[in-house]
């Protein structure tokens, strides 16, 4: 037998020298076999998972072992015994288990071609020869050998017994450790790890499978270490695949051939040296063929793409495992390609993505979204540069070039134009950008089409002007907004009645006009011109809501003429003032007086004609005078004729006429103000007072010129007086005949008197009634009445993301209104201010907490302003003919009264119930009693209202509007009872425990709400009694109620389909009919709560998602008013009731987060979220939510178009306001807030500066102040902060004070009193 064909087994069994070289040969060959037998280089094939072959012992003994055996048995060297005894009588040198292992090794080695068949036969022959020779030599001296052999057996058995005992001890210890580990695993996790017994039994006979020990005690003795190189096909459902890992893709399914077979492994897997045998070459060729066939089988398998990560921190971000596909061209370089993919840098990925976006832009140049995505993606390259400032400029230039190319393909795109100009303002000079804006606006306004003006362009232009500090002036902004409004009115005239969606276009345009009016009023008010703003709103409301009936068919010029006479009359106070009666009544009085005057004139003329004969000379003189007067009157009449024919004139001619009138009125007003100082004594007294004041000021300046503290005190007193006058003298001044009131006004301050010329350009009539009501609400919000935050009873007027509503939400600047935002938030105990343990900056946010719980003047309004607002409500509700939708106005008036005095509000609501018999007022009356803490009175009101509903149903068939009110009353009654149950258990949680321990069912808690639902569906209310429900029939009762809800829902859906089909012909009435015919929000809320009580949280969630995700129903379209009300009210009640019926808290939290994804800054949802997470003290979870949404807020990726929300940032700051060590986070929140469109909001800059002052960082506060005046050059409060804050004034010198005052005068900010003059 040659060495080339000698197997490892034969080489070990035949040792010619007998010196133990066979052992060395065995070690060498064993090392080679184990080295070649290692698996591939994948992460599964590391050293800890190799197959253990340490226990493998060969079956043939060597001569050294025989020598050791002869020494052990005391055999002489002269003895002829040279071979071991026969197998039947010789003691075993290994145990039975080792025999089995050797047999298995033989089978494995045969399968893997370690042993040739020929060598195996030769070895068997050698064994037979050796055994026959042993038998021949065993005849001599067998007695001593048998004795020693028995002795050896006993000792061997003792050793085996001791080894078995030690093994049993070790196994017991391992089992105990394993039991301890198994207790840590849950049933779900354990079931994932355990391999089923069926599958393991199928593969137990095959020795090549090493079953995992973890979790399966049957196969625990197979191996001491876990091995993961078993066949995965029965687990994964596919053969020839395994799970791999890479840095780029993570865990992925890859074919075994990808890592197990390459060229080197194929050549060196089974042989350490190249073999010349034909059998080995044929085997290697067959293996290559099998590898190629396996690769061809998996070529067409597609990749499994991962799921995109959800940004919810509470949800898992697990991706699906990818499947790698092998291509035919790169079989040999698979490992190299994977290494390249793993080592692919982030820069390479960004370049790939950038090239893809460039290709999309080239293919679809008219797609604006692709251009914007390409521009925004350029920001990703900034992370690869070391110098951030240089990279920003280069990035801006690159983005500008992309925008230029996009505008070449889309020159009429407003979005691209606006984004281009926004970006240019960051890089170019402001004057250059302003010139470019003027070109854009002139080209857009010169169009002769119906789109003569673009609201978006003008809004962005105003935003640019507010940020352009160098060129900013109040008068410029005012003129710009007025020109925009006039152009929009011209656009409204271009609409024709026959056009499609005529009323919708009119409504949208008028809403845009209201937005510009609101913006103008806020700018003028913040600049100090509050009287002019109030005059504008007064004139618009009088002109639209109190139009005289006699002038309803008159032209615009006639209306302006008559309104001018009414406004300039001194006998009739305007709306808001005491004893105001409105334009309509005052016009009838003026008309009657003019008729009486004409009659008197006619009588006088008759008397004069009788005396003509006696006074001829006098008559001649009088005629001459009369001729002169007639000439003057003719000129005036010509002007009036021009005003009467205003509709026939062009806009330019109208402007000329109005300017002429302005000049005349200005001259008249100057004459009026000159008349006020006729008496010489008053003039002399005033001059003496002024001289004395000037002398005192000069003496103070001389004495305190070197004393900076006194100078600062002067500036502080001046600034505080200026702010006090703004708060006191906010109302316009009426000009009386004697003009005695003007003594309190500065002689140079004529801004307190509002003239007709100050607002005549803004006078126009609204077409839609809803916009007239919105004008009133806008005026009330300007005066300090937050309509949307007063109470939940006031329904929103617009959808959540409507620009008008977003504007009112983001215009919060009053600290008292801010406290109303957090009324639903569970207040944390505020730390004591003098305590040294808490930082000083805590007192910055004291205004956030509403400590005034006595419901007296929650709005913090002054008495004169409360009377002014009350007069507006009364006049509009009692005397207005122009507003027909007064129900919302009544509700807001009740809630305004409740915020001032709740008892007065209850008396007024009771009078409305007796007057109108409206179910809504009954509901409000019950809610006011509930707020007062009178629960039983509120329940009595609801019960009497339900009995009254029974009478209404029996008398006549209820109309649609009446049915909606019935749904409202029952739903409010239901929610009141549920809230009482929740509040009772929240005060004493032991009640619920005692209730459950007494073997009561949770449904028994809600018998009263279920009774209300039964009466609601039956349409017949009955008094609740304890015998109403029976526990034995409760399931049958719930099934009946469920059927009734389903039947009612189907009926309403059928009516909706019929009404929608009938109203499809008339487009004007389609919007109103769809809302009135749909299922009411209150009915759907009752249905959802019933599902929660009867079928648990699962049944409720199915119904809620089915209702809110209905795409066919426009009534419940996402972000609509009805969708918002349904979502907010339903989740509010679910968070209270669902924990009482054993719902998992995590599911409730997920429901809140899903709703916040739709309404990310809703105050109610944010309060619910913070209250829910605060129970578990999970601060990081709340911070993660605000951090993730702040990115969307800054990048304008939320649902709104405003690009920022003041409510969102205020809630984020409020959450951190009472936490020690949160100063840096609050500072970062302020910086993020002012980087959005909230940079023009006063409240953030004001709080930020005060926050840094309380931290003791005055220099930082000073730098923030200079940043604030650059973004808010129109805000008088921001300008005067160094003059009103004593701490901040310490770091300003006299020169800086004087410079600030000069800038205030330059920007056109109004100052009521003279500024102190102090030398630098």
From Swiss-Prot:
One of its GO terms (cellular component) is nuclear speck. Keywords: Coiled coil, Nucleus, Repeat. Its main location: nucleus. It comes from the Eukaryota. HAT repeats lie at residues 348-380, 428-467, 864-899, 1221-1254, 1256-1288. It is found in: Nucleus speckle. Residues 170-184 have a biased composition (Basic residues). GO terms for biological process: mRNA stabilization; negative regulation of RNA catabolic process; regulatory ncRNA-mediated heterochromatin formation; RNA processing. InterPro entries: HAT (IPR003107), NRDE-2 (IPR013633), TPR-like_helical_dom_sf (IPR011990). Pfam families: NRDE-2. Residues 1-55, 74-203, 598-644, 676-716, 1056-1078 are annotated as: Disordered. Residues 96-106 have a biased composition (Basic and acidic residues). The keyword Translocase does not apply. Residues 146-186, 591-699 form a coiled coil. Residues 14-26, 118-129 have a biased composition (Acidic residues). Residues 34-48, 598-640, 703-713 have a biased composition (Low complexity). Belongs to the NRDE2 family. Protein of the nuclear speckles that regulates RNA exosomal degradation. This is Nuclear exosome regulator NRDE2. It comes from Dictyostelium discoideum (Social amoeba). The lineage of its organism: Eukaryota, Amoebozoa, Evosea, Eumycetozoa, Dictyostelia. The gene is nrde2.
